[in-house]
Amino acid sequence: MANYQTAHAQERRIQELDQTVESIFDVRKRMGKGAYGIVWKATDRRTKNTVALKKVFDAFRDETDAQRTYREVIFLRAFRCHPNIVRLVDIFKASNNLDFYLVFEFMESDLHNVIKRGNVLKDVHKRFVMYQLINAIKFIHSGNVIHRDLKPSNILIDSKCRLKVADFGLARTLSSRRIYDDLEQDGMLTDYVATRWYRAPEILVASRNYTKGIDMWGLGCILGEMIRQKPLFQGTSTVNQIEKIVTSLPNVTKLDIASIGPSFGSVLLSRNIQRDRRYSLDEMMKNCCDDGISLVKALLVLNPHNRLTAKEAIRHPYVSRFQYASAEMDLHMDVVPPLKDHVRYDVDQYRNSLYELIDRETSCSNRTVSNSTPSSNRDELPKPVRVTKQARTTSAKQPTTSPAERKKEPSSVEVTQSRKNIKLLGSAHKAQSKEINHMESAITQVSIASAPPAAAPPAPAATAPAVPRKSGDKSVPKCQHNNAAVQRELAAVAAAAAVARRKKSSWQSQAQSQGKFHTEAKAHVQTAIQTQKDNIKDSPPRMIQESQSLTEAKAPIPKNRYSNKMCQEKKYKKKHHSMSCITRDTFPSETEHRQQREERAYQRQMKRELQLKESYRRRIEAESEPLKETTEQESKTIKVIEQKVCEHTEKKADESLSKDQQKDSITFGTCVRERIHHLELEMEKCTEELVDFVELNADVLNYANVSTHLKKLQRSKESDEKDEDDRRALPEGIGGPGSQNYEIFRQEQEKERQRQVQEFLARDETNEYDNLDLDHAYRAKYYTAYKEIGKELNPAPDSGGRDSGSEHSPGRDNYTTYADYFLKYTTPQQNWNDLERANGLQREHDRIYGLFWLNDRRQEEKYRRKLAQNDQEELPVHHHKACRHRHHKPNHHAPYDHMRPTEDDIQEADSLPESN
């Protein structure tokens, strides 16, 4: 039951606020509670701003807590200019000298709660959060300070994704080697789970080699948690934490262990731990982008010297898109606390250093005190009792000094104390003014009662009443603060004089002691007034007048020479007051004169500006007209140039087209002419060769062989009827049948050639080159065929003649077609000369046709090779209908004889299909 009551009382004390803090801030709700403090959301009554009020309970309980509190205040003040570090607004001390109050700017949430909610942060938000975090750490590291406690709960964030780093209780400098460190003592403790998951390996193994890489490891853990939405290494103890880290990272080398430094925990890193691929960084962050995985791997490196620095990390592709020059903030000097960071001092030294810091800030900002309770964070007013006690102690230590010296020494101490109080006080409250008035009346009564009735000076004149103050006036003039300090000094001097009078020797009379007292009091008053002279002069004339009247009313008036001097001083003050009134009366005229001068100067300046603007406008109008004309001319010129360019382009296109057509026509005409000329030459050659062949083989081409061939190769009657006109016999007496048919052949061939030339020339004009028909140039079907010769002219197959079926017969199974080239014989008694002539013509025709066919095939092969080499399509101007020829059928009945023409060799042209 007792333990429960104690715990309940402790909890109630934690929840309570100091009276001074409660009077300044309106607490709205509690935001959170930690191991060292509690945070409220509050509103400042003075500025109406929403702030975060943090109470550090038992801040000076021991040296460790005192050093933690001191570090947090010092480093927050040093880094308060950075936008990504939480700003310390104000600090307050508690009345119990144990608790401590810190006032921060208000932030809506922290990163831990944002991650815990789920998919609140998108990829761009994570990148921006990481950029701000790296930017803040870079600024901290530029001051040679490390945070050492980076975790999501220490990173504040608002709805606009603005981030601020907080909680600098574990931060420290790297300027010198430390003697004591709180992390060395509890580095291996298992109850500090919240931060263990984000600690670097060198801290887990209790290494003394602290570097800035500690914070970079924490950044990697935070980024991994944002991407994975849960911590990367959730160790249940320090050993388990090290095992999880080693499992996820690559193999540990001796160089990695040496980089951490010798420690008892380095043995854990050197152990062979079985690695599971499921817990590697690649597997845990498989859903992340490549840039994010790359940054995490670069930060989570076992060797602290190989980790990315803050300056390198801010240029990483994952966050480089947010980098801009204006955000680059660095400290160009190290942050050095007033108390050395590597030495642990007493609790009182840390407390006194912080209290002095509060006093200096109070003096600089001139803040007002909300009430005069003892729990205020401002220094209390010195009580006269304490001053008297100090004076007694001082006089007891110096018994040989004179009474004047004994009174002078405590007064100097009080003057110094009063100066300090004047700097610390921002204003005085009504309760303080009442207390001062009561004290002054008590001092006056003591000074009057100290003298005997016989030697008492005449009663002083009635003091002037104090200037009343309105209850609604909240501002207190500065001169009243100074006057209050003077009155306190007078009270201290009077109290010290009273004590001295009670202890003085019996031989000194009361009149003498009273005179000395007044003389010394006058000197001390003059000294106090001189110390506050500058502050009084800085006040407005009305406040100076009020302070002077208040001083005259409250100052004690002696009745001897001192009173005469005081009267003279009053006259001087009245004169000074009249001069101030004159100055105050003439002040408005000078002000009005100055305002008039300023107004005239302003009017002149405005007039000059208007004139300048008008001149600029006229100049622009004058310059714009020629510019418009020039622009119009240029536009017209550009249009003309465009038209000419278009016409020139069209003309060039037409010329190129006509040139191509002309070139094609010239090429086609040249091709046709060359072809005709070539055919003529070949016909002449074939004629000569045919004649030579007939002369050489006259014995072979006898009448018997010809009759045999005519019988087998006689044409049908239908074809004879179609060519009846062409096969009409010449009149008797005009040449032989062979000469008649040859002359007809030559005439018809010449006509056909002329007709084809005309057709080619006509097609050359119409560009119709697609279907050229040159079949008639090679066919010879204009000779009349012989009629069937009687069977009696054919020898028996085995008679032994030329046409017999024996091996020695040269005309066996040779079915030649001479019928198309010779006349039909009605009687077998035809003239032998005519037959010989016909046979010669037939041989000549066969030779010419064979040469033509071979040459044509040769030309076609050359033409095809040329097309294949150029890899181009066959042009229409070169296209003509190819003549298809039958292949020679192999004869399996008789051996080949070169002197024996076959039907395929002699009459192949007759079997070709008619062209369309």
Curated annotation (Swiss-Prot):
Record's catalysed reaction(s): L-seryl-[protein] + ATP = O-phospho-L-seryl-[protein] + ADP + H(+); L-threonyl-[protein] + ATP = O-phospho-L-threonyl-[protein] + ADP + H(+)
Basic and acidic residues bias (residue ranges): 590-608, 715-730, 800-811, 894-903
Outcome following mutation: residue 190 to A: Does not lead to transitional endoplasmic reticulum sites disassembly
Keyword check for 4Fe-4S: no
PROSITE patterns: MAPK, PROTEIN_KINASE_DOM, PROTEIN_KINASE_ST
A single MF term (Gene Ontology): protein serine/threonine kinase activity
Binding-site positions, ATP: 31-39, 54
Keywords: ATP-binding, Kinase, Nucleotide-binding, Serine/threonine-protein kinase, Transferase
GO terms (BP aspect): axoneme assembly; cellular response to amino acid starvation; cellular response to starvation; ciliary transition zone assembly; Golgi organization; intracellular signal transduction; lipid droplet organization; negative regulation of cell size
Gene Ontology CC, one term: cytoplasm
Feature: compositional bias, Polar residues: 364-376, 390-403
Biased composition (Basic residues): 883-892
Induction record: Amino-acid starvation stabilizes protein level. Up-regulated upon impaired ribosome biogenesis and starvation.
Region ranges (Disordered): 364-419, 452-477, 588-608, 711-742, 792-813, 883-916
UniProt-listed InterPro entries: Kinase-like_dom_sf, MAP_kinase, MAP_kinase_CS, Prot_kinase_dom, Ser/Thr_kinase_AS
Boundaries of every Protein kinase domain copy: 25-319
EC number annotated for this UniProt entry: 2.7.11.24
Residues annotated as the enzyme's active site: 149 (proton acceptor)
Family: Belongs to the protein kinase superfamily. Ser/Thr protein kinase family.
Role summary: Atypical MAPK protein that regulates protein secretion in a kinase activity-dependent manner. In response to starvation regulates protein secretion by mediating transitional endoplasmic reticulum site disassembly. Mediates inhibition of insulin-like peptide secretion upon disturbed ribosome biogenesis and acts as a downstream effector of TP53.
Protein name stated in the entry: Extracellular signal-regulated kinase 7
Organism: Drosophila melanogaster
Gene: Erk7
